[in-house]
Amino acid sequence: MLDENLVTYKSLKLPCSIDTAEAIEQMERAVEQSFEQGYEAVSQLDPLLLFQWMTKIIYGVVYNEILAGIRQQKASGEDMNFSQALAQRFTNLHAMLQSLVVPMEFENTFPFSLVVVPVENAPDTFMYRDEINTLIFSIRMKDFAVIACLQDNATNNIYHEDILKTIAGKKLHPIQFEELCARYFYSAYLFNRLPDYTYLNTPQKVYVEPMPLADMSMKPIFDHWQNKTYGQVLENFWKPWGLTLFEIIKNPEQPISFLLDDQGAFITDVDMPIN
């Protein structure tokens, strides 16, 4: 946690009603059954259900981080200084999580990017990452992996459209998935919009419409991609294979890749351990 305490996921608690707890339990069972079966079942899951499951996790983490921050500020005698951008993201996340208990329709597009890919993982693999400020999440286990940007209006999937087309239907080596994951985590950092939504409550359901991202600023939606910074992200994601930043960006114009060859084609044979 941000206060440097280590806690288990099971120990994270937050308040909810009995009806909500029952809806969460039902959702958890559906996701657990699919995860137990593996990639084929997970890839067939309703994207909204996966979004709800991941949002519940991130929401719980953020909620407990806020409580820890309040305790720290109270102990130091200072007022709580909370990022307004994070507060807006947190508010929208909480509103969309209500789709567990309230019929909700997302107009035009889902508010998230989601990628589910098959991965040749080692037995008992479990790799989880999240980044609270950018609301990005990844998990790798069994024979699959998932990446989700929880509040980007599917923009990161558009940003990575070419590589997603290239790897479609391909089973990834773990180092290939970690490269894909690094690309998403870095692009989520470069994403310079703060998505906002209008909520229309009707007796039947809640309609959620995203505000146009292009209208929010004259700047490009993503900041400029810097290979050195991307290389630093890759170095962190590739720690199990011991690759250094120097090796990764030996050619500063073209960082090393295990996903694509020099012609941009998918690399089918990767001579690296399955970590």
Show which residues each predicted segment covers:
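An N-terminal structural lobe/cap that precedes and organizes the functional/catalytic core
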Residues: 1-39
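Low-complexity, flexible helical/coil segments
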Residues: 7, 51-53, 183-188
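Short, well-structured alpha-helical interface segments that form or flank functional binding sites
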Residues: 12, 49, 134
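Short flanking/linker segments adjacent to small metal-binding domains or redox-active Cys/His motifs
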Residues: 18-26, 51-90
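Generic secondary-structure transition motif, activating predominantly at the C-termini of alpha-helices
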Residues: 35, 39, 58-62, 74, ...
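Short microdomains enriched in Cys/His and/or Lys/Arg
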Residues: 36-51
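C-terminal, charged low-complexity interaction regions
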Residues: 77-275
